[in-house]
């Protein structure tokens, strides 16, 4: 899956996949400007278990343009992206950043974080590279990070921030 973002706020991102039977491989790099066409859906039967009701673009075709750099993350709070927030779906596919967070719980699949709002949000490593995955495995309850950043998505029944690399994890304070 790929995350596509046009802007830096709510409703500016989407998750998409390239068709499995694509004849020409498409090579995209983070920060590339792309033109994508496809079908918007909230229910893709091929992805029900993993992505459930995630708004997705399917049967996508992609034209890669020039490198323009990564989008600016939407700075949000745990209150904005907790599981039952009023507009939580509006951040799907958007690069989000949360500042001054505390790891509040660790389990086998994800990490819960809180901030000054008192709400809890989830971090996940499904999109993480090996270095980020290793760093996340060292996080413990009570650790404080100056910021976390990642692509916001819905998978396996929960909304979460998908960490991509070590830079997304900020500094432990």
Task: Identify the role of each PLM range.
Residues 1-173:
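Extended non-catalytic accessory segments flanking core domains
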